[in-house]
Swiss-Prot record:
Subunit structure: Homodimer.
Superkingdom assignment: Bacteria
Biological processes, Gene Ontology terms: organic phosphonate catabolic process
Keyword Transferase included in the entry's annotation: yes
The enzyme's E.C. designation: 2.6.1.37
UniProt-recorded name of the protein: 2-aminoethylphosphonate--pyruvate transaminase 1
Residues where N6-(pyridoxal phosphate)lysine is found: 194
Catalytic activity: (2-aminoethyl)phosphonate + pyruvate = phosphonoacetaldehyde + L-alanine
Primary enzyme class: transferase
Entry keyword set: Aminotransferase, Pyridoxal phosphate, Pyruvate, Transferase
Pfam families given in the database record: Aminotran_5
Residues passing through the membrane, by range: none
Amino acid sequence: MIRGNDPILLTPGPLTTSLATKQAMLRDWGSWDAAFNAITGSLCEDLVRIVHGEGTHVCVPMQGSGTFSVEAAIANVVPRDGKVLVPQNGAYCQRILKICKVLGRAHVELPIPEDRPATAAAIEAALKKDPSITHVAQVHCETGAGVLNPLPEIAAVCARLGKGLIVDAMSSFGAIEIDARTMPFDALVAATGKCIEGVPGMGFVLVKKTVLEGSQGNSHSLALDLYDQYTYMQKTTQWRFTPPTHVVAAFRTALDQFLEEGGQPVRGERYRRNYETLVQGMAVLGFRPFLSPDVQAPIIVTFHAPADARYDFRTFYEKVRSRGYILYPGKLTQVETFRVGCIGAIDDNEMRNVVSAIGETLREMGISMQPEGRVRAA
């Protein structure tokens, strides 16, 4: 799917983008220009449609990385006297805990092993144990290891117990089904440089209208105030502060390609084929995935590092990179791993090519793989 000599990014974002998406950034836009503001408006409408949130939810775009929008969502949706339950099974859950701490929001951590998903039963028990909890902040796809947390069941528990739900869908939005009609949430956060296959620089929050209307004054920040951002956009069609114009234009092109491809079902199926091709090919080389297939999201796969003493991730990374592929280091605490992403403007043929590149690298490093061998400790 990719032409030219650019490296293929096998990461959970930034990721490899199409030529058309890159070309969309060749034009300059005025941030107050009506044509540019129409692009922003059309993006927001389409993003709400992807989760079937028409009439109940609105889209608030926000400058910056996805984490900016996660912080904005927590700061606006959770009142200053609120309390957040954070099911924690990875690095991005830990980031939410840090955000809550910095914001001064009371919070409770629900520890979960990094190779297991959160469960609705555990969340329900935690909510019943502490009735003062007002919200749950749930990472949908925890890309620290690649775990897919069961959002439909968690959303049902929150709705039944009257708790607000904030979803970090950074690495799942556009690839895994999310339906606001059957998975109620107060806010859902994603970003341009993930499964819609745009470039980094803008996040967005899909927030329930009634929740946003009641959030005035909650935010600790001027720049991250979703209520102010939305009301200003409604009045003027403009962003409050300078938007990432090239990022927005590229995202419009990426979203057009997403819709032309067939939307979430087809995009998700392509990523699943990428995942299956990768795992099957790596198994032939002797690599074992860290996660069980029943909890693995088809977004990024964590593999155990070779047990061979000659293995060094930096050397391995550079040699694979010299063959045109950029991998991701592991983010786990107990075992040494590395990660390979399955998302971006790539297909299963590209996954076969990366498996070949990894196999060549192993031979060059003199590494012998034993599929059932030891796992090298971190």
